[in-house]
């Protein structure tokens, strides 16, 4: 393998011109990059077939500015075949990553995090648990992680108490145990242990709250597709 080739996954693609496509790629050791690839000539059909989601690629690119240019690319390993709910979850991973990971900022650990969780979708694991694990770890990498060890007053999270979460404040103890997060649930979320249904449910509520400022008002298409399929 050429030393200038990088492992990458396609997150999003769209037409750019009659002979070029614009690609948002997650590149190992680099982060998310926006690239142009020429798709024309006798190899056009082959190249279009290779530029698919969930297929690991080796890409060779150049360009000093925001937009990079792919010189060569080739398949790397066998494609990951997702179907049913696995496929919708894969689309969600791609769209979420594409939307909240900054382009052209060096966040080198995102590729490995994505690669691991993408493969976990195809492993028979609880799909919702895989998504929650990815969301919380991705938020941590991007600097939006939550401190699950201490509440807003600096006291350790107590498994027997109930908490509410407030952005830029943290967890505050509340008196009503019928709502909010139990300390036991928070400790489980911190350890990415989503084996209990109540923990998985509360983790989803918290992750959506944390992701909303990053996603803005534009809905995720993958969520809409999944909802329509049910």
From Swiss-Prot:
Pfam families listed in its UniProt record: RecO_C, RecO_N
Functional description taken from the UniProt entry: Involved in DNA repair and RecF pathway recombination.
Coiled coil: none
BP GO terms, sorted: DNA recombination; double-strand break repair
The keyword Membrane is assigned to this record: no
GO cellular component: bacterial nucleoid
Protein name (record): DNA repair protein RecO
Lineage: Bacteria, Pseudomonadati, Pseudomonadota, Gammaproteobacteria, Alteromonadales
Family label: Belongs to the RecO family.
Keywords for this protein: DNA damage, DNA recombination, DNA repair
DNA damage found in the keyword field: yes
NCBIfam families listed in its UniProt record: reco
N-terminal signal peptide: none
SUPFAM superfamilies in alphabetical order: ArfGap/RecO-like zinc finger, Nucleic acid-binding proteins
Annotated InterPro entries: ARFGAP/RecO, DNA_rep/recomb_RecO_N, NA-bd_OB-fold, RecO, RecO_C
């Amino acid at each position: 393998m050429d030393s200038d080739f990088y492992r990458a996954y396609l997150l999003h693609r769209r037409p750019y011109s009659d002979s070029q496509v614009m690609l948002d790629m997650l590149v190992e050791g680099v982060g998310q990059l926006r690239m142009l690839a020429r798709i024309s000539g006798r190899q056009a059909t082959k190249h279009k077939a290779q530029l698919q989601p969930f297929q690991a690629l080796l890409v060779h690119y150049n360009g000093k500015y925001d937009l990079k240019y792919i010189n060569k690319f080739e398949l790397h390993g066998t494609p990951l075949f997702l179907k049913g709910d696995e496929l919708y979850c894969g689309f969600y991973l791609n769209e979420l990553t594409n939307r909240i990971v900054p382009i052209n900022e060096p966040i080198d650990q995102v590729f490995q995090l994505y690669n691991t969780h993408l493969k976990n979708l195809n492993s028979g694991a609880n799909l919702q648990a895989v998504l929650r694990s990815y969301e919380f770890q991705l938020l941590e990498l991007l600097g939006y992680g939550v401190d699950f060890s201490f509440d807003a007053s600096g006291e350790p999270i107590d498994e027997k108490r109930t908490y509410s979460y407030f952005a830029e404040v943290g967890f505050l103890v509340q008196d009503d145990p019928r709502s909010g997060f139990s300390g036991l649930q928070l400790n489980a979320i911190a350890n990415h242990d989503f084996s209990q249904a109540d923990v998985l449910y509360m983790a989803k509520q918290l992750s959506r709250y944390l992701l909303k400022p990053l996603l803005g008002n534009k809905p995720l298409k993958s969520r809409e597709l999944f909802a329509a399929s049910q």
